[in-house]
Amino acid sequence: MTENQLYPMSSEFFDTGSNSSSNTLKYDLYSLGSTVVGAALPTLTINTGYGSSSSNNNNTNNNNNNSSSHSSSSNCSTSTTNTCNVMLSTTAITIPRSSNHNQIHHHPYQQSDLQTPRHHPSPLHTLPSMTHQQNQLQQQQQQQHHNQQQQLQQSHLALGELSDFGLDALDAASLSPTLLQDVSLSAVSPLSTTLYNGNTSGAGSSNGIGSGSGGYFTPDMSHSLSLNVVSEQVLLQEATTPNELLYEMTPNSNAMWSDISSAIIHTKHEPFSLDDDYIFPNDKAEIQAADLSDLNGGDFLDVIGNIEDFLPQTAVTQSVNFLLSPQAQGQDALVAPPMELLQQQQQNHQQLQVGSLPQLQTLLTLSQQQQSNSSSTSPYEIYHSTPQKPQQQQLSASFSPGSQASQSPLTPPPPPHANRPQYQMVKSRNMQELIKKGFPMSSPPERSILSQSAALSPGGSSGFGSSASGNSTTTSNQTSGSAVRKSFGYQSAVENSQLSRLSSSAPTHLGLEHIWMRREPRQHLLSTGSLAEAESFSSLSTGSVLSPDGIDFSQDDEDDNSSENSDNYDDCSSDNGLSEDEDETRTSTPNHLSSSKGKERFFWQYNVQAKGPKGKRLVFQSKLEDPHVLNEVTDPVFSPTCSVRGIKVYKHSGKARKGDGNDLTPNARKLHNIGKELDKLSRTINDMTPVSELPFNVRPKSRKEKNKLASRACRLKKKAQHEANKIKLFGLEIEHSEFNVKAVEISYNPSIFVL
C-alpha cells in the first residue's frame, strides 16, 4: 500500500558543527538517530504512525493503546495506527509515500497541538492519511502480534538436534547459500515488525511536551538480533518507560543459525518430496544372513504376516510421529506413541505368536543389525552406490526382471537427509493406511508362501529369487499363479483375497500376463521369416551355413507364419557396417541362437524393407487352391496375376533383375561364394579407421569409401537371400512330393498308417 522513496544523503548531512536551524530535517534526523539508537547501529529502522483523527485528548492519563481516535497524532501507537517504515543510513533515507492522493496531506513530524515547543522541520513530501484502511491494518497487526507470541512460546530446536533431518552441527555450518535462500524466513521478524513499542502512559499530556521522548519507540529486536529478553511480559503489554532498553546484548549470540533452525522447524510444514523412481540397489555383503535353506521346514512362513512387529518400537514411534506431522510436534511430543501404532500392535499380537521360533528371531535380529549398520552418516551417501543398502528393497526385484525400475506408489523411497531406519517407519505407516481401507494384512499360508519366500531370499535380483527357486517345493509351484496374481495391485480386493504384507513394494499396475511378457523377452519375427532376438545387431552379420556341423534349416520353416510388413527392420547403412564378431558367428551353430543375443543371423537374411519400401508393395490374388497341387513358380516382377497398389494392373514399380535372377535352379556353391565375399567386406570395413578419429580434411573421402563398401555388402546380401530362397523352395518341393506319395499310399492301404 505504501511506496518508498530513496533520498541520497551525503556525509556532511550529519555534521554536528553545522547550524541546525539552517536545515531542519538534518537536525531532526540526526537527533533521532543519536538519542534513540546511538552510533552503534549503522542502520536504523523507524516505525512511525499517524492518528487519523484531528481531535486531541486533553486527559492527563491515556492508557488505551487500542484506540487511535483518542490519541494525539504525534503519539504513535504501533498496535492501532497506520505504520510506515523509515530506513535511515549514512547513504540514503527511505521515506514511504502513500499511493492514495485523495486524503488530507500533513507532515509526518507535524504536531496538531500548536503549543508544543518542538522544532518543526520543513515538509519534504506530504503524506496523506489512510483512514479507510485503518481497520484492515489493525487486524493485520493483531495477527502479527499473535504470531510473534506463538513464536516466543515455542522452544527453538538446537543445532545438535538437527540429526533428525540428517544434519549435524558441521553439516549445518557448511550449508550452501542456495540452501539458505530456500529456508523460509517467516520465523524471522519481517520488515513490518514493530521495532519500537509506543508508550502512551507517559506521553499523554495535553500540550504534548512530554511526547518528545515518549514519541519514539523502544527497540524490539529479539528475533533479528537473538537478544536475551529481560521481561517478555512487559514487552507484550507495552507498558515500559520510553527510554528503557528491554534487552541485553549477547556478544557471542549466533543470530543467523538460530533463525535458520527455527525456520526449518516451524516453517517447513510440507512433507519431503520423494521421487517415484528412487531405488536403493542391493549388495551381496549385506544379505549373507540365514536363508530359507537354514530354516527347518517352511512352517515359519505361516505366521510371518507382519515383519514390522520385530522392529524397535521406540524408533517406530519417534520417526513416524515426527515425519508425518512435523508442525504439530514439539520436543516432548515424540515420547508418546500414536494410537494407531498401539492398535496395530494389539491386533498383530492377537494374530501372531512368534515366541516358539528362535531361528526366525535370530534371522530378524541379524536383519535389524544390518539395517542399523546401514544408516547413512553423510547426507550425500544416499545418492551414490554404497556398500550398505536396505534389505527390504529385494522385494521390488524378486518377481520379474523388468520390475527393478518400477516402484510401488504404496512404498516411497527414503527421503534425502533422513536416516534409513525412518524409511522403515514410513513403510509401516503405509501398512496402517491399508488397514484403514479394509485390506487385511495377514495372508493365509497357501497364498503368502511365494511372495514372502521371494522377499526373504538373498538372491532377490534374479527372477523369483535364486535361493527361493532352488528350494521351491510342490506347494509353492502349485500356488505360484494365484500368489503372484493376489500380490500385485488391487485385484485382491476385487477377488476377495488376502494382500500379503511383504508384497507392498511390488509393482501394482501389472497383471499376470504382463508379468510373463516382461519375464521372457519375446522373439520378433523378421520380414524374412526367421526368428531373432529383440537385441540390436548388424544386418550384415553372418551365420553358420558354412560350419562343418552342417546346416539346420528348422528355423527357416517359420516363413509361412511370418509378417513381411514387420516394423523391426534392420538398417543396412554405412554407420552399422559389418559385424565385428563375424568370425565367431560363422563357426557357431544355430542351437546357440537363444543365448548369443541375436548376432547369429544368417548372412543371407536380408531385410528387403530396411530403408522402407523402394516402391509399391505387391498384392497377390488370394483364392482357394488344391493343397496337393503346387503352383507354378512365377516371378512377382513379371507375373500377370500380380498387381501393384496405386498403379494400374500388370504394372510394377522398379526394374527387372539383371543377370540370372529369374533362374530358380538351386545353387549352394553360389551361396557359399557370396558368404566369402561378405566376410572380406566385413573385414575391410572393420579394419578402416573410424571417421571420428580422422582429420577433418580426410573424413569425407573415408566416409565415401566406407559407404561404397557397405552398399556392395547390401547388394551381396540381397543376392544371398535370393539364393537361399531357391534352395528352400527346392527342399519344400521335395518334401511336398514325399508327403503326397505317403498320402496316396495311405489312401489305398490304411493299414500301413502308424501313429
UniProtKB/Swiss-Prot annotation:
<feature type="modified residue" description="Phosphoserine">
    <location>
        <position position="595"/>
    </location>
</feature>
<feature type="modified residue" description="Phosphoserine">
    <location>
        <position position="505"/>
    </location>
</feature>
<dbReference type="GO" id="GO:0046982">
    <property type="term" value="F:protein heterodimerization activity"/>
</dbReference>
<dbReference type="GO" id="GO:0005829">
    <property type="term" value="C:cytosol"/>
</dbReference>
<dbReference type="GO" id="GO:0006357">
    <property type="term" value="P:regulation of transcription by RNA polymerase II"/>
</dbReference>
<keyword id="KW-0158">Chromosome</keyword>
<feature type="modified residue" description="Phosphothreonine">
    <location>
        <position position="589"/>
    </location>
</feature>
<comment type="subunit">
    <text>Interacts (via C-terminus) with REPTOR-BP (via C-terminus). Interacts with the TORC1 complex component raptor. Interacts (when phosphorylated) with 14-3-3zeta, this interaction may assist its cytoplasmic retention.</text>
</comment>
<comment type="similarity">
    <text>Belongs to the bZIP family. CREBRF subfamily.</text>
</comment>
<dbReference type="GO" id="GO:0005634">
    <property type="term" value="C:nucleus"/>
</dbReference>
<feature type="modified residue" description="Phosphoserine; by TORC1">
    <location>
        <position position="530"/>
    </location>
</feature>
<keyword id="KW-0539">Nucleus</keyword>
<dbReference type="InterPro" id="IPR039165">
    <property type="entry name" value="CREBRF"/>
</dbReference>
<dbReference type="GO" id="GO:0006986">
    <property type="term" value="P:response to unfolded protein"/>
</dbReference>
<dbReference type="GO" id="GO:0042594">
    <property type="term" value="P:response to starvation"/>
</dbReference>
<comment type="function">
    <text>Transcriptional regulator that acts in the TORC1 signaling pathway to regulate energy homeostasis and promote survival during nutrient deprivation. Interacts with REPTOR to form a transcriptional activator complex that functions downstream of TORC1 to up-regulate the expression of most target genes induced by TORC1 inhibition. In the complex, acts as the transcriptional activator. Under normal conditions TORC1 is active, inhibiting the formation of the REPTOR/REPTOR-BP complex by phosphorylating REPTOR and mediates its cytoplasmic retention by forming a docking site for 14-3-3 proteins.</text>
</comment>
<dbReference type="GO" id="GO:0000981">
    <property type="term" value="F:DNA-binding transcription factor activity, RNA polymerase II-specific"/>
</dbReference>
<feature type="domain" description="bZIP">
    <location>
        <begin position="697"/>
        <end position="755"/>
    </location>
</feature>
<feature type="modified residue" description="Phosphoserine">
    <location>
        <position position="442"/>
    </location>
</feature>
<feature type="region of interest" description="Disordered">
    <location>
        <begin position="99"/>
        <end position="154"/>
    </location>
</feature>
<feature type="modified residue" description="Phosphoserine">
    <location>
        <position position="443"/>
    </location>
</feature>
<feature type="region of interest" description="Disordered">
    <location>
        <begin position="368"/>
        <end position="422"/>
    </location>
</feature>
<feature type="modified residue" description="Phosphoserine">
    <location>
        <position position="596"/>
    </location>
</feature>
<feature type="compositionally biased region" description="Polar residues">
    <location>
        <begin position="385"/>
        <end position="409"/>
    </location>
</feature>
<keyword id="KW-0597">Phosphoprotein</keyword>
<dbReference type="GO" id="GO:0005694">
    <property type="term" value="C:chromosome"/>
</dbReference>
<feature type="region of interest" description="Disordered">
    <location>
        <begin position="538"/>
        <end position="596"/>
    </location>
</feature>
<feature type="compositionally biased region" description="Low complexity">
    <location>
        <begin position="52"/>
        <end position="80"/>
    </location>
</feature>
<keyword id="KW-0804">Transcription</keyword>
<dbReference type="GO" id="GO:0045893">
    <property type="term" value="P:positive regulation of DNA-templated transcription"/>
</dbReference>
<feature type="modified residue" description="Phosphothreonine">
    <location>
        <position position="665"/>
    </location>
</feature>
<protein>
    <recommendedName>
        <fullName>Protein CREBRF homolog</fullName>
    </recommendedName>
</protein>
<feature type="compositionally biased region" description="Low complexity">
    <location>
        <begin position="368"/>
        <end position="378"/>
    </location>
</feature>
<feature type="compositionally biased region" description="Low complexity">
    <location>
        <begin position="450"/>
        <end position="483"/>
    </location>
</feature>
<feature type="compositionally biased region" description="Acidic residues">
    <location>
        <begin position="554"/>
        <end position="584"/>
    </location>
</feature>
<feature type="compositionally biased region" description="Low complexity">
    <location>
        <begin position="538"/>
        <end position="547"/>
    </location>
</feature>
<feature type="region of interest" description="Disordered">
    <location>
        <begin position="438"/>
        <end position="483"/>
    </location>
</feature>
<feature type="compositionally biased region" description="Low complexity">
    <location>
        <begin position="133"/>
        <end position="154"/>
    </location>
</feature>
<feature type="region of interest" description="Leucine-zipper">
    <location>
        <begin position="709"/>
        <end position="716"/>
    </location>
</feature>
<keyword id="KW-0963">Cytoplasm</keyword>
<keyword id="KW-0238">DNA-binding</keyword>
<dbReference type="GO" id="GO:0038202">
    <property type="term" value="P:TORC1 signaling"/>
</dbReference>
